């Protein structure tokens, strides 16, 4: 099971991402601002961090920089800021992908899978997916969702 940290100050977005990813077999912890996201990041082990850019206390850009100083963990920005300058600033901070709101949850899920697989070095040839069940043939584990 993959573990994801989702930080967004909008409750509806946090909850919809959490519910969707958990239904797909992920473990998800959420934060309402960048400061609490960094606390969770330092206290837990995650496979991916999803950050909103505009959050109270510590914004997503600063949170991404802090994550990047401590880890090479994939970071995905999820934000309403969709101008070219925002994209460039996000990538300069060290993010691995950038999704503009509104977004389909199915696309976010596939981006999460892609980033985590690349980070963990998971070869898709070692995976078998059938009817909502994924088998990791390399370690003989099954994931439902």
Describe each model-derived feature in a short phrase:
Residues 15-23:
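Charged docking surfaces used in two-component/phosphorelay signaling
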Residues 33-36, 59-62:
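Acidic catalytic/metal-coordinating carboxylates
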Residues 25-32, 40:
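Short hydrophobic/Thr-rich beta-strand motif most characteristic of the beta2 strand and flanking loop
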Residues 14, 56, 83, 101:
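The feature encodes the CheY-like receiver
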Residues 3, 113-145:
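Short, Lys/Arg-enriched segments at the junction into DNA-binding effector domains
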Residues 8, 52, 79:
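Active-site residues of response regulator receiver
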Residues 44-50:
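Active-site beta3 strand of CheY-like receiver
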């Amino acid at each position: 099971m993959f573990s994801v940290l989702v930080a967004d100050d909008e409750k509806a977005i946090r909850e919809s991402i959490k519910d969707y990813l958990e239904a797909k077999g992920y473990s998800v912890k959420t934060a309402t601002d960048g400061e609490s996201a960094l606390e969770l990041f330092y206290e837990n082990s995650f496979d991916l961090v999803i950050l909103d850019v505009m959050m109270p206390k510590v914004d997503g850009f600063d949170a991404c920089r802090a994550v990047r100083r401590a880890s090479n963990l994939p970071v995905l920005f999820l934000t309403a800021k969709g101008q070219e300058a925002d994209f460039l600033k996000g990538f300069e901070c060290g993010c691995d992908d950038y999704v503009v709101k509104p977004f389909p949850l199915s696309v976010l899920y596939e981006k999460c899978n892609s980033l985590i697989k690349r980070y963990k070095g998971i070869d898709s040839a070692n995976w078998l997916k059938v009817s909502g069940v994924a088998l990791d043939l390399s370690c003989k584990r099954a994931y439902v969702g």
